[in-house]
């Protein structure tokens, strides 16, 4: 392959740089097993740790793994080395939407098609509790047929039911007024605003809000101070006006755009895609169950799956640290009692440090509060199914193994 040198990551030959950010480079990759191209996002682990962005990287991986939609970039696998994290993704050959725009407006039919694909993808995310929060042309890619693909979920959020998000993020020209006000906000409404800015840019060739100084730019956004150039139709103006409403409570929703807007609906065919089979049943079980303070979400299920366990992504190999996960067909409270019983059986004491998390130590050193031998956390999957995550931070491996065996035997005996 002329495009590729001798550098390889796993089964992938690594070629030229096709994208670059603050903490990562995206390289063109070649899968030697099937002859296909991929995009390999290579993240500098040390730099991410230095900036405290571990959770953001994990969030991007988990989000991309969860979502399965033709207008969202797909993730294939994650490869970790001592210094790098490599996310192997679908290769989108057409480049960024921002390159296609280049201060030049699109034909109405092309703009509508891309906007429909954007809305369809974002609506798919929102229906699964995922909010992008940084939608902009630089994060929208085009494939060889001109179809749109949403990428870069590093700022995405999955809040608890009814929660308001509070982290300010996004790019200045595309952020919603409520982000500028630095108040709690709805991730759904923020994404809708960004979609409106993108639609304006598709039709005009430039964004509605732009200025060299941030204070002036923010004032324009807060007042929704923009002017339509010649050529915009009444239907286009009405839709953009309803989207770029500074009040998130009265701003049009995605459902209203899809169902009610006449301009949007021209030639629109919604895409219905399901979650991947490996997690579909788990997510369905979650949606049917009642919520709790420690209720597991789909992202945690993915993180616990054998093909995408991110728990050690930023940890150096250390023979003194161990982690085990055991399933329990009990309520969370009953599972805590099982943990206490298993610990007692092997002469360990249990101290609750959170509602569903305990510290486990040999009884004779209980007074030494700085000595943490084991910890066990109960994560509720459904009201009668839990996952117990057991971690060893210090002490003898023998005691850790004895406790795990004791708990496993206790839980196995009750279902046999």
From Swiss-Prot:
Residues 152-178 are annotated as: Activation loop. Residues 321-351 are annotated as: PPI. It holds the Pfam family NAF. Its cofactor is Mn(2+). InterPro entries: Kinase-like_dom_sf (IPR011009), NAF/FISL_domain (IPR018451), NAF_dom (IPR004041), Prot_kinase_dom (IPR000719), Protein_kinase_ATP_BS (IPR017441), Ser/Thr_kinase_AS (IPR008271). The modification Phosphothreonine is found at residue 167. Residues 291-315 form the NAF domain. It comes from the Eukaryota. Its EC number is 2.7.11.1. GO terms for biological process: cellular response to osmotic stress; cellular response to salt stress; signal transduction. One of its GO terms (molecular function) is ATP binding. Belongs to the protein kinase superfamily. CAMK Ser/Thr protein kinase family. SNF1 subfamily. CIPK serine-threonine protein kinases interact with CBL proteins. Binding of a CBL protein to the regulatory NAF domain of CIPK protein lead to the activation of the kinase in a calcium-dependent manner. This is CBL-interacting serine/threonine-protein kinase 21. It comes from Arabidopsis thaliana (Mouse-ear cress). The lineage of its organism: Eukaryota, Viridiplantae, Streptophyta, Embryophyta, Tracheophyta. The gene is CIPK21.
